[in-house]
């Protein structure tokens, strides 16, 4: 089972995905401007990119679980660079 971090602040959330996993799933080209990157860890926004990633995992038979973390203010993820393939 794949364990994925899911960080949420009061107004948004992001799911962590390894760049190699995104490449394996054919998802390096994300559609939103609200996903971020921290070296090879990509933080996919929860409204569009995250669900596409989770659907792709299910499609290829990879089970996953999300580990939720909530912040009171803006999440530190907002300070990362925007994702670029």
What are these regions (language model features)?
Residues 37-46:
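A short, exposed loop/beta-hairpin motif centered on an aromatic-Gly-Thr core
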Residues 1-4, 28-31, 66-67:
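Intrinsically disordered, low-complexity boundary segments flanking structured domains
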Residues 1-18:
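Short, extreme N-terminal segment that most often corresponds to the first beta-strand
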Residues 10, 19-20, 46-49:
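Short, flexible beta-strand-to-coil junctions
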Residues 47-85:
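Short, compact, well-ordered microdomains
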């Amino acid at each position: 089972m794949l364990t994925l971090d899911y960080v949420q602040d009061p107004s948004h959330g992001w799911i962590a995905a390894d760049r190699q996993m995104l490449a394996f799933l054919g998802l390096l080209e994300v559609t939103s401007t609200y996903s971020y990157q921290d070296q090879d860890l990509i933080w996919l926004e929860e409204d569009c990119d995250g669900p596409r990633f989770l659907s792709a995992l299910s499609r290829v038979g990879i089970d996953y679980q999300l580990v939720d973390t909530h912040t009171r203010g803006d999440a530190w993820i907002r300070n990362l660079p925007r994702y670029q393939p």
